[in-house]
Amino acid sequence: MYMKIRSVFSCLLISAVSMLAARAADQLEGRAVLPAATFAQGPTSGQQLGPNPINGQPVPFLNKQPVQGFSAVQDNGDGTFNVMPDNGFGALENSADFHLRVYHIQPDFKTKDGGSGTISVLGFFELRDPDKRIPFTITEQFTDERILTGADFDIESMQRAADGTLWFGDEFGPFLLHTDASGKVLEAPFHLPDFDNPGKEIRAPQNPFNEEATTVRIMNAARHHARLHGNNKAPVCSPWEVMLDDGNANTFVDNRQAPPVGSGLAPASSEIHNIASIQAAGYPVVTYTVDNTARMTELLTLKINGIISDRSDLLYGAVASYDANADGTPGDYLDADGLIDIAKIDAQGHRGSRDLRPENTLPAMEAGLDNLMTTLETDCGITSDGIPILSHDPHIQAQKCSRTDGVPYEDVAAEVLIKDLTVAEIQEQFRCDKLFRGPTQQNDPALSPVTVDFFGGDASQIYVLPTLQQLFDFVTFYTTYYRTGPGSGHPMATKRWKNAQRVRFNVETKVNPRTDEDPLHPGQIFALRTIEPTPFAQKVANVIVSNGMQERADIQSFDFRTLLVVQEQFPQIRTVYLFGDFPKFDDPAIAGSDDGTNMQPQAGAGPNTPWMAGMFWPYRSTKLTQPFRAQTSGGFEGMAITPDKHRLLPLLEKPLAGDDQRTILMHEFDLASSSYTGNRFKYQFDPRGVSIGDFILTDEEHGLIIERDNTQGNLNGFKAVYKITLGAPGTFVNKELAVDLLRISDPHRISEPGQPGDVGIGRNFAFPFTTIEDVLFFDQKHIGVLNDNNFPFSVGRHVGSGQPDDEEFIIIKLDRPL
């Protein structure tokens, strides 16, 4: 019995050794390398990559596009190949300036018989959407060609159909994208149905049909539009503070959490605008309106760029007491003069300081200046004589203002429109000094000595609605008042004049694009209560320019049409994009109904909001009703096409939420009907695997899949090509190891010479890259493999020098036929 067991053991050992030898005997037959720092013509890219340099590579890439990140390959049958980079730099936030392209390359493989081992780039074409097939906002939204970028799609796979058109698998949706042979989009992207949850879709966190992924897309389009017109100031994103994705369950929009009966609204998450994501994309985040110290401190901790507050006194106190570096000493956001450092936080007095003085009046602005705000936030209307005047509303509101002649002015329905009166008429007939915001709001002229002095001592004038020009004049007057005038002896004089001489302005254009009726003012159409958006923006901007305030004044709006005008005609002025959800209810008589600002579509006027200049906002489609089952970078990574060219089999890179976390899915897509069949196949990871890199079919039922871990430069890592066999739909594919990519024989030393400290070069060749995303089938004994070099981030080969990985294209001769 002992001898029998020993004999069996010996046989098993010999078999195991033979298998290892077979794997190690897979042989490097050819290798070609495209240097990491290879570039093609194109606009500057990599502007959001962060610290410079990265792995020795200077960034950004001025007036050029890197040829890198190959994630799909096609054999043209003539010694050339088409290779497809992915989205560029790995994230939606940092890839808006990376053009989606397909490059035409020709490798001259180094083999035992010779060859240079180089790759020539012969040309490229770009993916583009001139026919506007894509329904959501893209970076080049406002161009004719609409070239697609890595912030629009993360394409990871590519197949050519029988008709010569191209199909791309995307991770952001995940989507299938269909183009002609030149890269022009032919139809809207195809969603992936969630067959486990009928009526739902499989969505990733970057899906543009969820609100959560839309803010950055809109800001990208806004910035690109600005740059087209010479405005190189990054626009500001200004979301409502209760709609920040901050993980605070106590901040939400009431009518999102519990829509009133009769409102016609759907419930939705309020966790929409992610501060870190927006900032990573290159946009300052200034939130409104925050009026308690605890919340201010919370937002400072979240590294917000700016806070707008009705309580300028509390805001200064919160900033002054903030200990950013936790060393026990507050004041980290103050400069040497004790003033707020705007580079660290922009503290804005909302409508001056509306909880301290009547809003949008000079006393309110004086309060904001007294409390050392870095910015005075305000709103403008346009009078009948074309003058910008400070007002949040198109009417002279009865709640805020009274008539100077004593005639009662209480009926909201009878309120006068600003556009129907001249400045002189408004300032002669109305005073806006009513108190309704609580006990901290006061209108005693003694509290506003600078304003009284500005009006020559006539306290009866201080609560007129001032013009924008008067605001600029007042700030200059205030500076002099405390520097050399009556206030120069005040204990705060130095801080006040120093702050006032540099204070900024954030001026809102109060325009409403809706064409339905304002229920508070029967017979009035929202859009007709003010002048048109273009002259509105022009008149505000002209005052800024005439005062030389282009570096100190921003123009903000919920109506993005006005901001596009500013970018086009006044490129020295920075724009601020306001986001909020103040819906008009189906029954506007229900308490809380508002004017539709600025996400809500207008009833009967199409599915999109009229506020965002045609950019798409997926109103109230959030993770509450459409959760994210696909992971970030977990969408379509590999995609096979059947030999008859009838079906695609896109394969998810990572498991879905709610599924077994070692299993990923292939979905079958019928090209004739352009629809998913519902057939799915399961693929199970090796215990070491975390992602797949590519998937192709070699015949009707067999294929190759690259599977990997996340290591780089590690010869003990896991990088493998598996041969798979499809079974019946719904079952696991059978898999067996075809190539261990870290154990390839190089008896002819094709891979040499390398650089000092290179990993995996020489007789024992390896492909030690983080991501390996391309596999080609040549014949039963030969396959091709390419890495995705993640330029300039990954260092898997050149560990010794620390230089970024090159693109490598290898041909492997298999020890055993497929």
Give the residues covered by each predicted segment.
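Bacterial N-terminal signal peptides that target proteins for export
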Residues: 1-10
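Intrinsic-disorder-associated interaction segments
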Residues: 2, 461-464, 731-734
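Short helix-loop boundary/capping segments at the starts of domains
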Residues: 14, 75, 79, 108-111, ...
